[in-house]
């Protein structure tokens, strides 16, 4: 199998968050006995996993940065990073972040510059600056592109070079539905049918070097292609999940924090009103829908930054407390603390 990786990534944004580390990369490095994998990141980590754990025999990475300032920081011994991650990653991560932030001050952002700790060629990958060369005869095309609006212009340059039946994936910078539309608008539905092109995601749901997981979107690829990618993901990433394409963003992107809170609220509310109060599921669903729709409508009407002006968070303290029983009692006390801090 040939894997084409389009976009090598840059560590500066990972370092800037102040919370990421190389836990997964170190784990894989130890598993396969290749320390140089320990400080890979982004698509390079996922490419190494697919090569070493899933048997992908050809990996090509395409990025214009290879003709520019692709910078490899070699201040840290891979073995030291691995050992630190066995105990506490924060024993070494502050120094790594400090160095990255220092280098980033002088280095241009992608595609003019990028920060890495291992060169892809040292992992047995081929490199190129030509996306068309990379995708030629590729079975699996993993894209790691800038934000969504820039992607049509990039994709249109190589779309005609994708072989029939190939799997093409995106990550965190675009929804699957919009990603599919780029291909559909170029060639129409006939050419984007599964026998011609399988559009889905290989979304890590976090920085790949930190967590071993991948989320695969269903709806725009054949069942066979989804199953193939799922099996690869299980071998390479350790944990793989299939979900409807429409849910990929809410589950995997930064709004996942809100999705998690909302989903936990729905589930505990449902159990409280149906199991304790004995309300029919249909009635519980109707009330839940009203809550979600009206809060969304309020946000749309006044803006997320002005919601408190229309609905005082304190208004819920004297009403929701009457529902503080059953499963809802698992989360409501913490919710009340948050609302109390924000009431007018």
From Swiss-Prot:
Keywords: Methanogenesis, One-carbon metabolism, Oxidoreductase. GO terms for biological process: methanogenesis, from carbon dioxide; one-carbon metabolic process. The keyword Ribosomal protein does not apply. It catalyses: 5,10-methenyl-5,6,7,8-tetrahydromethanopterin + H2 = 5,10-methylenetetrahydromethanopterin + H(+). Pathway: One-carbon metabolism; methanogenesis from CO(2); 5,10-methylene-5,6,7,8-tetrahydromethanopterin from 5,10-methenyl-5,6,7,8-tetrahydromethanopterin (hydrogen route): step 1/1. Pfam families: HMD, HMD_N. The keyword Oxidoreductase applies. Belongs to the HMD family. This is 5,10-methenyltetrahydromethanopterin hydrogenase. It comes from Methanothermobacter thermautotrophicus (Methanobacterium thermoformicicum).
């Amino acid at each position: 199998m040939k894997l084409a990786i389009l976009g090598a990534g840059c560590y500066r944004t990972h370092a800037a968050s102040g919370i990421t580390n190389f836990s997964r990369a170190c784990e894989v490095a130890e598993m396969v006995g290749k320390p140089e994998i320990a400080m890979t990141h982004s698509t390079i980590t996922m490419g190494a996993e697919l090569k070493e754990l899933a048997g992908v025999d050809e990996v090509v990475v395409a990025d214009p940065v290879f003709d520019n300032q692709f910078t490899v920081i070699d201040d840290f011994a891979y073995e030291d990073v691995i050992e630190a991650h066995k105990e506490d990653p924060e024993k070494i991560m502050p120094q790594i972040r400090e160095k990255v932030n220092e280098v980033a001050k002088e280095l241009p952002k992608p595609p003019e510059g990028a920060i890495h700790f291992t060169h892809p060629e040292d992992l047995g990958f081929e490199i190129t600056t030509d996306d068309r060369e990379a995708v030629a005869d590729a079975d699996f095309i993993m894209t790691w592109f800038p934000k969504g609006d820039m992607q049509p212009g990039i994709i249109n340059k190589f779309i005609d070079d994708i072989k029939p039946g190939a799997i093409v994936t995106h990550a965190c910078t675009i929804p699957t539905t919009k990603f599919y539309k780029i291909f559909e608008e170029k060639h129409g539905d006939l050419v984007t049918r599964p026998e011609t092109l399988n559009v889905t995601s290989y979304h890590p749901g976090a920085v790949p070097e930190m967590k071993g997981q991948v989320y695969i979107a269903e709806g725009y690829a054949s069942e066979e292609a989804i199953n193939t990618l799922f099996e690869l993901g299980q071998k390479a990433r350790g944990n793989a999940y299939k979900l409807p394409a429409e849910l990929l963003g809410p589950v995997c992107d930064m709004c996942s924090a809100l999705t998690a809170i909302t989903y936990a609220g729905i589930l505990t509310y449902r159990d409280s009103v149906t199991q304790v109060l004995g309300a029919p599921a249909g009635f519980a669903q109707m009330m839940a829908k009203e809550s979600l729709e009206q809060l969304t409508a309020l946000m749309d009407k006044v803006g997320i930054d002005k919601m408190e002006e229309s609905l005082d968070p304190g208004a819920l303290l004297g009403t929701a407390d009457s529902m503080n029983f059953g499963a809802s009692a698992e989360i409501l006390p913490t919710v009340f603390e948050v609302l109390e801090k924000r009431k007018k």
